A protein has these predicted regions:
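Anion (oxyanion) recognition and catalysis
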Residues: 41, 87, 117
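A glycine-rich helix N-cap at a beta->alpha junction
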Residues: 75-94
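Cys/His-rich short segments
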Residues: 119-173, 177
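Structured secondary-structure scaffolds
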Residues: 2-51, 99, 104-108, 158-213
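Short, charge-patterned binding micro-sites
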Residues: 53-59
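A charged helix-plus-loop insertion that forms the helical arch/lid used to bind
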Residues: 63-76
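Feature captures the FAD/FMN-dependent oxidoreductase FAD-binding
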Residues: 101-121, 131
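Residue-level detector of anion-binding/catalytic polar loops
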Residues: 46, 70, 92, 122
Length: 213
């Protein structure tokens, strides 16, 4: 047990989509994170090690349809498979496994939304884009080849025209740059920190955070 006054250490993997089976890339990420978590525990840190499953998105909905299952039943099945992968890999038994359909996650997301809205960081506007379901990203005409995404040529590009909520990401550009300057060791290694700073300096763009469909 860590001492009550021990330093806290938080580490999380990305949360894999459950639209397909786990693969070697997931195993590598889980194992790397577990190694770091175990090492920090040995150093006396109070470690919170997090992983889980991202269960929202058009890809997952369509995959559930393909298999003739209700979306919730589909994600329940694949989340269980993902937990079995963690067990098979010998990942730390105290890892926190969060699902984006968990009530505690939903409640936290709602509270975060309300906080952002209260502070003026959420607004509505019309949203008209070309969207690749495979990438789950907006695509410009210059990124398409024969009106198709080069990475997912068998998937039809969807034209979305609807009113969406947007997050005012642009409001944080100067605040982040100032924070980075005042906290030069916030991200390690340095070359990754430089990539982050360069990204912010290029200009942050507001982005959609909702879907009607």
């Amino acid at each position: 047990m860590p001492a009550l006054n021990s330093k806290k250490f938080y580490i999380t993997t990305t949360l894999p989509y459950v639209n397909a089976k786990a693969h070697i890339g997931h195993a590598l990420e889980f194992t790397r994170a577990d190694i770091i978590a175990r090492y920090k525990k040995l150093e006396g840190f109070d470690v919170f090690f997090n992983t889980g499953a991202d269960e929202h998105g058009i890809k997952i909905y369509k995959k559930a349809q393909e298999e003739g299952k209700e979306p919730q039943a589909y994600v329940d099945e694949y989340a269980a498979k993902l937990k079995n992968v963690l067990k098979m890999l010998g990942i730390s038994s105290d890892v926190n496994f969060i699902r984006t359909t968990d009530q505690k996650h939903i409640k936290s997301a709602q509270e975060f939304w309300k906080l952002c809205e209260k502070n003026g960081y959420i607004y509505k506007k019309n949203y008209k884009i070309k969207y690749c379901i495979g990438c789950e990203l907006e695509k410009s005409d210059s990124e398409l080849i024969n009106a198709c995404c080069p990475e997912h040529p068998n998937l039809q590009i969807e034209n979305i025209d609807e009113e969406n909520y947007f997050f005012k990401f642009s409001a944080f550009e100067e605040k982040l740059l100032k924070f980075y300057e005042e906290n030069p060791k916030f991200v390690i290694p340095d070359f990754r920190f430089n990539e982050i700073k360069a990204f912010v300096k290029r200009g942050l763009v507001d982005f959609s955070i909702s879907r009607l469909k």
